Amino acid sequence: SPTKVKTISKILGPDYIVKSSVGHIRDLPRNTKSIPSKFDSKKILWGAVKPGNFENIYVIPEDRKKIVSELKEIADTAPEVYLATDDDREGEAIAYHLKEALEIKGEPKRIKFNEITESAVTKAMNNPDTIDVGKFKSYEARRTLDRMIGYEISPKVRDLGGAFISTGRVQGPAIRLIVEREE
């Protein structure tokens, strides 16, 4: 957020450029029409996935391309890149995707803090970490399952009940539990 950027900039001083990605910058395609042309969307069968033959395809949504371009321009000239996102799976995914999309040379420094105070930011800057790939893979597994199940099941559910109905990995079992409880 602009307020966080301003506060962190003030703490770090003029030697640092602080910018925000404003959240996620890459995602799985929303539908097969969103799959980049270098991939054959006819070969991607979201419902028939076997271990070992599935590869996630990430795209930069149109509304994120400008910010990615701006961040890449800064990262290309920076002697070091620090990635400060939330210390959870979503934050790790944002950091991972920033590293990939910005084509950061070398390993970016991953910093984490739970409050934006001078002591917390300084401590994080003095003790950088690396991107936790395990935490990213955890995010990726959840996101992939959500998308695969949603792609397959939501259109069928909409056919039964209306344009704005969807279901997924969590919704389906949760609804089942509610139905069983009510019976």
Model-flagged regions — what are they?
Residues P2-E140:
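Intrinsically disordered, low-complexity regulatory segments
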Residues R142, D146-E183:
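Prokaryote-biased recognition of long, low-complexity C-terminal linker/tail segments
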